[in-house]
Amino acid sequence: MSLKFKNAKRIEGLDSSVWIEFTKLAADPSVVNLGQGFPDISPPIYVKEELSKIAAIDNLNQYTRGFGHPSLVKALSCLYEKFYQNQINPNEEILVTVGAYGSLFNAIQGLIDEGDEVIVIVPFYDCYESMLRMAGATPVFVPLRCKPVDGKKCSSSDWTLDPQELASKFNSKTKAIMLNTPHNPLGKVYTKEELQVIADLCIKYDTLCISDEVYEWLVYPGNKHFKIATFPGMWERTITIGSAGKTFSVTGWKLGWSIGPKHLIKHLQTVQQNTVYTCATPLQEALAQALWIDIKRMDDPECYFNSLPKELEVKRDRMVHLLESVGLKPIVPDGGYFIIADVSLLDVDLFDMKDSNEPYDYKFVKWMIKNKKLSAIPVSAFCNAETKLQFEKFVRFCFIKKDSTLDAAEEIIKAWSRQNS
């Protein structure tokens, strides 16, 4: 093969994907899919109705403003001004993107240079590392560590950063830190005190913060989501990322947004105008109208920002009980719609799994899909090479699923438990 057909160096070693691999394995209709994080519950009726109405309007089927449909950026500005306690310029401080992925890509390409160091908290959403390496940056990893409290169920809040270890990762080469709260896959919701430690270090070392907050509405009782961009000295150095897919359970719409100061957002705009240019007009208009419906009733229990976490809290508690009933010790998430559990306690014989070089959780999930018809995601996929051992006994289950899907998963898990008893 011609050397000219060889891949560009910037994507060297980035060709494997946990999502492609395990989505393919779970494609069999007989497999109960608690793997990839997409809802199989119905989105709100009014969201679908808005899209249906808008699709019939001719001019809304054409290109729109490249940095965000005017009605959408206005709605986003109105929504988030309530939390930032200051005006957000819809045209200069908000950028609508092709999903949160697009926001991450624009931020990294627009702000991170070759040779820059970027701090990544482990576990992390897998594309963080890939996007940073494509930009020529050096990811610097720091792990969350579990410090369980005796006599208490292990929760995502038990996973914390060591402040001294975190501080040791900052230096003159540090360009940014990647923050994810509520966290995927742990479900950790960073406290105000934890975020203040990060903010203080960002200010001390003049470091940017790329804050992935796509699960911002999915926070369970006893916890509160804080935006690090609202901390003193942080607005001017923070890009905050949101997602329509996570907000309204419409992951297929692939709409996201970045919010930040004009002097940062303009660089993300440059990337967008020279790559995807714009996002789908009808989807943006439908999202805008859906947002206005809920903006006007944010204190109402029927507001989707309030009703979805209540619905998911029930599903979360059901999954916790189910996993505990078969002897597992799940990490109870404080936010998001994933739950992880240590599956090594099941003592499954994985001798017949071919690739002995794969981490334990990869082999376990492949075995579970094949033999139990139940899909999950290995948590070591969210780790760098050096920390995979720390997390390879955990798998991630998604619980934003219909009751019938969770019923099927429960049947599989309980039958499995009976076989082992």
What are these regions (language model features)?
Residues 1-30, 36-54, 81, 86-421:
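PLP-dependent class I/II
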Residues 34, 57-63, 75-78:
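Glycine-rich loop-to-alpha-helix module at the N-terminal edge of alpha/beta enzyme cores
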Residues 67-68:
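Short beta-strand to alpha-helix junction loop
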